[in-house]
Amino acid sequence: MPEREEPWRKTLETFLNYLTLERNFSGNTRASYLNDLGRYLAWLHECGVKPEEAAPGDIRKFIQELHEIGLEASSIARNISAIRSFHKFLLTERLATMNPAENIHQPKLARYLPSVLTIEEMATLLDAPLKRHPTSTFMLRDKAMLEFLYATGVRVSELLGLSRLNLHMDDGFVRVFGKGSKERLVPVGQTAISWMKRYLDELRPGMMSATSHDTIFLNSRGGPLSRMAAWNIVREHAVIAGIEKPISPHTFRHSFATHLLEGGADLRVVQEMLGHSSIIATQIYTHIDRSFIKEVHKTFHPRG
């Protein structure tokens, strides 16, 4: 039986044909729009929002996610340009009654400093599952997931792609397949290992279904946990923890790297654990906690 096509694909194809026929866009530009808008429309679909009903807040949340996954400012600017053109097209063609992207502006092409939690905020967030549902079915899953994200600094896509074969808990390592299927070994602390073992032994066997396969983190139906579900779990626990900063699964990665560097970890070692191909991508974490840098200067500089 053929897979049902998402309704937004037809709208996207109509827009791309308009770009080619009416505005003489090149094949490369068309391909860029296909990639950028495909990601945006798939995200809206996963959120349960139709393109013609999107609000400015939806677009801003999507742009925030682009920041959180580490997309360069120039790429984000290109995405915004595509989104603005798309919604303008929907309004012109009377496929929508408003243009939610009209007042969405291009970011300045400067380095984006990601949101990072303090060590105290992270501790509060990691305890939130115990406060939210200490006797609930999903407490073990949510607690294990949050602890694992912070302990390893893995991307959410890497987390959701984990299988039992990737875990080497007796050795204190996890095998991760990152961007471009690049493989790396990342250490896992004992606290995260303890919660992962409890989840895997006490909860996951009862959650499994025919669609579970070997995926570590499962949803309530026994299928693989989706990216959006992981986002919701993080945000719901952030509310419980009283954290008002913008937060996503990627915040754990940013905080992981920042806290390691604050503790004196070597930049190259952190680069290896994060799976960055370039040291430049890791260096951003040396510029985040200005208060920490000031404190170091005050403590160690003779004129501090």
UniProtKB/Swiss-Prot annotation:
SUPFAM superfamilies: DNA breaking-rejoining enzymes
UniProt xrefs under InterPro entries: CB, DNA_brk_join_enz, Integrase-like_cat_sf, Integrase_catalytic, Integrase_recombinase_N, Integrase_SAM-like_N, Recomb_XerD, Tyrosine_recombinase_XerC/XerD
Residue ranges occupied by any Tyr recombinase domain in the UniProt entry: 112-298
Domain Core-binding (CB) per the UniProt entry, residue ranges: 6-91
Gene Ontology MF terms in the entry: DNA binding; tyrosine-based site-specific recombinase activity
GO cellular component: cytoplasm
Compartments reported by the entry: Cytoplasm
CDD domains: INT_XerDC_C (cd00798)
Keywords of the record: Cell cycle, Cell division, Chromosome partition, Cytoplasm, DNA integration, DNA recombination, DNA-binding
Source organism superkingdom: Bacteria
Active site: R155, K179, H250, R253, H276, Y285 (o-(3'-phospho-dna)-tyrosine intermediate)
GO biological process: cell division; chromosome segregation; DNA transposition
Stored PANTHER family: PHAGE INTEGRASE-RELATED, TYROSINE RECOMBINASE XERC
Family to which this protein belongs: Belongs to the 'phage' integrase family. XerD subfamily.
Subunit structure: Forms a cyclic heterotetrameric complex composed of two molecules of XerC and two molecules of XerD.
Function: Site-specific tyrosine recombinase, which acts by catalyzing the cutting and rejoining of the recombining DNA molecules. The XerC-XerD complex is essential to convert dimers of the bacterial chromosome into monomers to permit their segregation at cell division. It also contributes to the segregational stability of plasmids.
Protein name: Tyrosine recombinase XerD
Organism whose genome encodes this protein: Chlorobaculum tepidum (strain ATCC 49652 / DSM 12025 / NBRC 103806 / TLS) (Chlorobium tepidum)
Annotated gene: xerD
